[in-house]
């Protein structure tokens, strides 16, 4: 059956505590909030389009001791359940997580205040990756364009306003990143920067390895650096979402793995938008000790 625009795009976002989320996620909120984390869970946390798939593949390669074939056992979105995912009649992210044996590696885009409380009470490990706001905004725009489960983003200029006002799915980039940054010393949180991962992947991968309590030989780490490069992952059907149905991701509009660079925002921001964004950034982020690289 051909998908009509009404069926192909679930355009409505709903809110939980002022945070816009996809409607099926909000409809399934009770199951998400009562999710039972386990003490040995590792939760990968990101704002959308901040290197989620990249860090997932790095973590999986470390967990599998650099065994490429084991990392190809299934597509990446099946390896690490996305806890807030809900799209009936498919099993929810919570359903999939509950079926997994321990130790589990899970993922989320939720801000700190919406995370199921059991993650905090069980003192789980959290791996957070932050990406500079300008590149994140651009990447999320192209994802919005191709995603069939998010609202139409409109023109770049229209989307620019939506993003800076925190009206995109999962809410404000500013609040999300600040929220995780401010609690990084209170819990077992490894806070990484996308730009550092691009600048020196081996160094950042070694940090992840130590955080996971693994000790791999240098040649294995070098192999992980190679296998998790953007070029390799873009061609890997286990990571490039090429198996996702067009009714969810339409990659004829924009590829899921598009550029993976630092500084692509310069190809989208007008001078006026850049000046305005910098002013908003100062207002929202001026009191934090967070520092991002806008280019390499």
UniProtKB/Swiss-Prot annotation:
Residue numbers annotated as active site: 109 (proton acceptor)
Domain of life: Eukaryota
Pfam families per UniProt: Sulfotransfer_1 (PF00685)
Compartment annotation: Cytoplasm; Lysosome; Mitochondrion
Residues involved in 3'-phosphoadenylyl sulfate binding: 49-54, 131, 139, 194, 228-233, 256-260
UniProt keyword Nucleotide-binding, yes or no: no
EC supergroup of this enzyme: transferase
Keyword terms, alphabetized: Cytoplasm, Lysosome, Mitochondrion, Phosphoprotein, Transferase
GO BP term, pick one: sulfation
GO terms assigned for molecular function: aryl sulfotransferase activity; cholesterol sulfotransferase activity; sulfotransferase activity
PANTHER family reported in the protein's UniProt record: SULFOTRANSFERASE SULT (PTHR11783)
Protein name: Sulfotransferase 1C2
Annotated organism of origin: Mus musculus (Mouse)
